[in-house]
Amino acid sequence: MARVFVSSVVNGRSDRVWARVRDFNGMPNWHPAIAESRIEGGEPSDKVGCVRDFRLRNGDRIREKLLGLSDYDMFCTYAILESPMGVENYVATLRLTPVTDGERTFAEWTAEFDCPPERETELVANIAGGVFQGGFDALKRAFGG
């Protein structure tokens, strides 16, 4: 099983950063790789079990299911249902933690998935650098860091 871990510090209070990322349908509002998103069946975007169907700027389409969401613990866990990446059993968590020294937020994004062994290095690098770090870089720009 492949594992990805990326972390960063965002120069903004955790409640403000969480307000930006908690909407399971809101990735186009903060992640530069996402062109559009919709929740299937008209479900609320914070209902565990809802499915988002989104399109990347490169045209690829991905479907993901919300597995967990906590405003108290500031995390969102989701699974990929369909993706052109060639991964299986993909589960990821985006978690925010307040930094007590100043108004900053520790952000971490993790994932575990199965893939062909010969593609693991490439997929881990693309997910870590393109998806996770790309999202953190956009958040840092949005919050002045």
What feature does the model see in each segment?
Residues 1-3, 73-75, 102-104:
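A generic structural signal for beta-strand entry/edge sites
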Residues 6-8, 62-68, 91-98:
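Hydrophobic/aromatic beta-strand elements that line small-molecule binding cavities or substrate pockets
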Residues 80-134:
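Beta-strand/loop substructures that line and gate deep hydrophobic ligand-binding cavities in soluble
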Residues 1-44:
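Hydrophobic ligand-binding cavity/cleft-lining segments
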Residues 10-12, 56, 115:
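Short beta-strand-to-loop capping motifs
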Residues 29, 38-86, 134, 138-145:
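Glycine-rich portal/gate segments that line the openings of hydrophobic small-molecule binding cavities
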Residues 13, 59, 71-72, 99-102:
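Short strand-connecting beta-turns/loops that link adjacent beta-strands
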